[in-house]
């Protein structure tokens, strides 16, 4: 597995264009990973997922969605790894320990373990428990266990978060060192630090001294983290990370950030800080939002986005989707998710193309307009 | 001119089973055929493309639901349901009457029509035969159904006879109201409850109206199966051979096989998709309730001989692990269950054409009831058409 990256200097900001290679598969960056819960992309059966081009060949599965069901015993009994179990046979998975689905219940984390929240409640997970679980999952990538705090956590608690996360990282590394079966699973170090610049930098510098494959930037999807803080903290953090390793940010497109500005802000994040991967899924269209519940779509027989090449826009109208949504028909979610993922993947492809062709400014103008 | 052409492809030399080709405006339909039910212009989370991939040639839409929401005006603007949901093959719509009687507390039947309280306002609305046809004309299905006076199949006494006569009067009003004879086929419905005389009289009257197809209604409402099959058997014996016969609301595997032996061509039922929503997979030996813990470590597919996407991709253990939390689980089970229904109908048809249908029925029943504990009604029904289990 390797990562090739080219830094593109654009009037002082450093964009990064890269390719993460594993086996015959490549994830181009900047790019997005597609998130799944318990192995399913919400709403989508695999045949519908297949209608999307350029789906990254690695699926992101958060620990919380699999620790209970299927869980360790079932996966061990199955014996062929998580990717195969979830029907993703030709491709691979990335397992994250952090669960950005809701605000972290960080006060329940302890020195020796973090708390993972599932449907039936809390499960305490130590770095060894976690590593054992990852071992039966056989992912291509996994993230180190982390104690993520929101931006408004106290200084003391934020420091503790950085210390614990480094300690967890070392234990994950130690376990990986001792177990050959994890050799093909690359470890990403979680970088913490809440809303504090000093702690962000300490976490980045310390993590950078460890033998890890890449870095994940945690806590940026927190409700307490506003866009301004994100843009202040990110460059100060990433300047302490080695250039040649990939960076992944979780949940940067949180629905708490105004979505319209989000799309243009997101390009700034990419431009100024050169994060390599972002990860999000949303029920709404990416660039400007259509609320398909609104009455005005009742008789609108045009596609969601004219010219969109996705399966949905080629086959169905706004009026039909409006009808499905207001009647709470499950197909409404299926169609919206399909279109949105297509747009999201396409968005990142445009970013990469514009970087390759030196058309970055033109692309930005398009999104800012 | 007719919007339907009917060809009898093969008849079983033992039983009354038959394989037909029913050519409709949008798509030819090979029978015996099961029609899945897409209530509101959608099949429970599946795209029209997925239904096409499974191989369905005809699906059912509900007039009551489509007529209230999105409504006939929008249906007209959308150029009909086919375009609205982007389904290029055939559609059948029911009359809407049955849905009202079964879904709404306040439905009241008069000679005029079915009176009911709008679920969206305080208004009292009236579904007349004319209105039902008008709505169905705007939906534009290949086959539309007359409004009939539906009584519970367990009802007895003069109400059953009244309903039968009213159904015939309503049929005449539907025929007069029907505007799209050239592109939509109006089917009549045999009523008469569980009374053989009434059924006979009803068939006699409606056959005179010479509609392109005929449905057998008023069954599948929890009546005694021994009476059920006798009514079906009587109707198929009385009905003309050169028209499709549609048994409404029937969709259990055993019922499909037995009723096909009795000479039924078309079926519809919400069962495969409804049972999928409750986590049940249909298999040739019965059903699997995948929520049960016995499947949590079962790494086989639902049915290793099933060609569906679900069986090719997932194990029972995986489905068991997502079934309580992910709607995708219910889409996956719907895909499997609908594939099962489709495959079953294809086997029935193939065996009728090859004249191996009696043996097929025996094999099917043996697999479904390996201990030989066959339901008596099925044994009797099949014996009546010379298939001895
Ligand atoms: Zn689209
Ligand atoms: Zn299957």
Swiss-Prot record, chain A:
Q: Which superkingdom?
A: Eukaryota
- Which residues are Zn(2+)-binding? 308, 310, 313, 339
UniProt keyword RNA-binding, yes or no: no
Keyword annotations from UniProtKB, A to Z: Cytoplasm, Metal-binding, tRNA processing, Zinc
Any GO BP: tRNA-guanine transglycosylation
Instruction: Classify the main location.
Output: cytoplasm
Write down the SUPFAM superfamilies for this protein, in alphabetical order.
tRNA-guanine transglycosylase
Give the molecular function GO annotations: metal ion binding; tRNA-guanosine(34) queuine transglycosylase activity
Q: What does the UniProt record say this protein does? A: Non-catalytic subunit of the queuine tRNA-ribosyltransferase (TGT) that catalyzes the base-exchange of a guanine (G) residue with queuine (Q) at position 34 (anticodon wobble position) in tRNAs with GU(N) anticodons (tRNA-Asp, -Asn, -His and -Tyr), resulting in the hypermodified nucleoside queuosine (7-(((4,5-cis-dihydroxy-2-cyclopenten-1-yl)amino)methyl)-7-deazaguanosine).
- Kindly state the subunit structure of this protein: Heterodimer of a catalytic subunit and an accessory subunit.
Cofactor names from the entry are:
Zn(2+)
Record's GO cellular component, any one? Answer: cytoplasm
Comment on bound cofactor: Binds 1 zinc ion per subunit.
User: What is the similarity comment for this entry?
Assistant: Belongs to the queuine tRNA-ribosyltransferase family. QTRT2 subfamily.
- List every stretch annotated Disordered: 263-282
Query: Gene3D superfamilies, per this entry?
Result: Queuine tRNA-ribosyltransferase-like (3.20.20.105)
Segments forming a coiled coil:
none
Please tell me the species this chain comes from: Trichoplax adhaerens (Trichoplax reptans)
A Pfam family found in this protein is TGT
Places the protein is found: Cytoplasm
The answer to whether keyword Hydrolase applies is no
Q: What is this protein called?
A: Queuine tRNA-ribosyltransferase accessory subunit 2
Lineage of source species = Eukaryota, Metazoa, Placozoa, Uniplacotomia, Trichoplacea
